[in-house]
Amino acid sequence: MDPYKNLNPKGYQRQRPFSSAGESGGSGGSGTAHETDDNKKKKKLLHRDIERQRRQEMATLFATLRTHLPLKYIKGKRAVSDHVNGAVNFIKDTEARIKELSARRDELSRETGQGYKSNPDPGKTGSDVGKSEPATVMVQPHVSGLEVVVSSNSSGPEALPLSKVLETIQEKGLEVMSSFTTRVNDRLMHTIQVEVNSFGCIDLLWLQQKLVEDLILSTGY
């Protein structure tokens, strides 16, 4: 007997099932890798959709912002960053304007009160002094829109009731948010808060002039 002869030739084939198992395992791994690739593709598509939606929403917001800005702040500027800077400058200018007009209003209120306390003509009563003052209208920007301040005599044909002021403002297509009236030395001061959707499109001086015409000039006050 040849000692080098393999007595069990099948023994060397016993490893084949092991090799087959390896092949089976490789097939399973390929399936898992395929599923992983599908998940990655789905995530990429989802991320792409979210990013596209975000850009559309931002474009809509910037378009809305441009409609609220006066032309002088964005004229000749196309970049979004320029529009944002224009909005910042507009807000700063508006805040400064509000402070300036508020200080002017307070000054006028103090002057009005002092004018009625001091009687320049001894032959006139305080009521007569009040009647000599014409009605006034002032329109100024406010945080939530506009503020309309109307001052008139508290009695007599020159008096401007709050109902008439509100009616005139609403005829201009403006929405009144709140209103209140104070009395200072026979004078009525109506303060009306008005909501404005597109502040940059309203000319404050034009609106003030129209209110003066409708409330004062048309009635001869």
UniProtKB/Swiss-Prot annotation:
Subcellular location: Nucleus
Biological process (GO), any one: regulation of transcription by RNA polymerase II
Keyword annotations of the record: DNA-binding, Nucleus, Transcription, Transcription regulation
Annotated InterPro entries: bHLH_dom, HLH_DNA-bd_sf, MASH1/Ascl1a-like
One GO molecular-function entry: protein dimerization activity
Region (Disordered): 1-46, 104-132
bHLH domain boundaries: 42-94
The organism's place on the tree of life at top rank: Eukaryota
Residues that span the membrane, as ranges: none
Subunit structure comment from the entry: Homodimer.
Name of the protein described by the UniProt record: Transcription factor bHLH126
Organism: Arabidopsis thaliana (Mouse-ear cress)
